[in-house]
């Protein structure tokens, strides 16, 4: 059990540390980052319950509905809601890159508990693939959500609406695409590899842009 928990936690902590330490000028308070991570952990339970009810009540159906609505939109909208009520209005959210840190924190909290539960059910031998695919996917989608929230936080009213909309729509579409590739396509690995390369490129590009804004503010 210790090996499973360690393998389940390690990729999330490693990715969170990476994005946290990239904030070179004004690191966020550790307690705020840990709180966001913990809120992501707690979020697993209501999402599991809602998905269970949707499945039992036969709401929707087919890979598209499950991927883009029951999984993608549901999970990302609740992460977005957590960020909006616990982080977005907070005084510590005072730089564009802060959105990256908090977005990654909530997403990786969710991904870490989900990863542990999966490894308990399927075995620690899946840990490496889990780290490369779902945990990384959650982290990068959280980064992208946080990027757009950072844009919204420091924009005028009209632009703010656009960035807030993108902060929910883009992560939901990316998450839905990941799930659809994984569950609906045969030979999914051939589609997943370029998708993950794109996701890493897109996420790291957004993180770099946010850091450059921070540098101009110093």
UniProtKB/Swiss-Prot annotation:
- Report the domain of life of the source organism: Bacteria
Task: Fetch the Pfam families from UniProt.
Answer: PrsW-protease
Variant or mutagenesis effect after changing residue 175 to A: Loss of RsiW cleavage activity
Question: Any idea what a deletion of this gene does?
Answer: Loss of expression of the SigW regulon.
Its EC top class is hydrolase
Q: Recorded E.C. number(s)?
A: 3.4.-.-
- Residues the record annotates as the site (Involved in sensing cell envelope stress) are 23, 28, 95
Kindly list the residue ranges recorded as spanning the membrane: 1-23, 31-53, 99-121, 130-151, 181-203
Q: Which GO terms describe its biological process?
A: proteolysis; signal transduction
Q: Which GO terms describe its molecular function?
A: peptidase activity
* Compartments where located: Cell membrane
Q: Cytoplasmic side: which ranges? A: 24-30, 122-129, 204-218
What protein family does this chain belong to? Belongs to the protease PrsW family.
This protein's name = Protease PrsW
Tell me the organism. Answer: Bacillus subtilis (strain 168)
């Amino acid at each position: 059990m210790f090996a499973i928990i360690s393998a389940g936690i390690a990729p999330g902590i490693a990715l969170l540390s990476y994005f946290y330490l990239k904030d070179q000028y004004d690191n966020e308070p550790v307690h705020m980052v840990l709180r966001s991570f913990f809120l992501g952990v707690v979020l697993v339970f209501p999402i599991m319950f809602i998905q269970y009810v949707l499945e039992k009540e036969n709401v929707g159906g087919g890979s598209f509905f499950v991927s883009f609505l029951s999984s993608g939109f549901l999970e990302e909208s609740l992460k977005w809601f957590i960020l909006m009520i616990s982080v977005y209005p907070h005084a510590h959210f005072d730089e564009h890159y802060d959105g990256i840190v908090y977005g990654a924190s909530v997403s990786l909290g969710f991904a870490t508990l989900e990863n542990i539960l999966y490894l308990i059910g399927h075995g620690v031998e899946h840990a490496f693939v889990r780290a490369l695919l779902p945990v990384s996917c959650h982290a990068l989608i959280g980064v992208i959500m946080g990027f757009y929230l950072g844009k919204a936080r420091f924009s005028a009213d009209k632009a703010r609406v656009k960035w807030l909309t993108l902060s929910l729509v883009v992560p939901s579409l990316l998450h839905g695409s990941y799930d659809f590739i994984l569950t609906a396509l045969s030979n999914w690995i051939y589609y997943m590899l370029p998708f993950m390369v794109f996701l890493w490129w897109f996420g790291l590009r957004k993180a770099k842009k946010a850091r450059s804004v921070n540098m101009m503010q110093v």
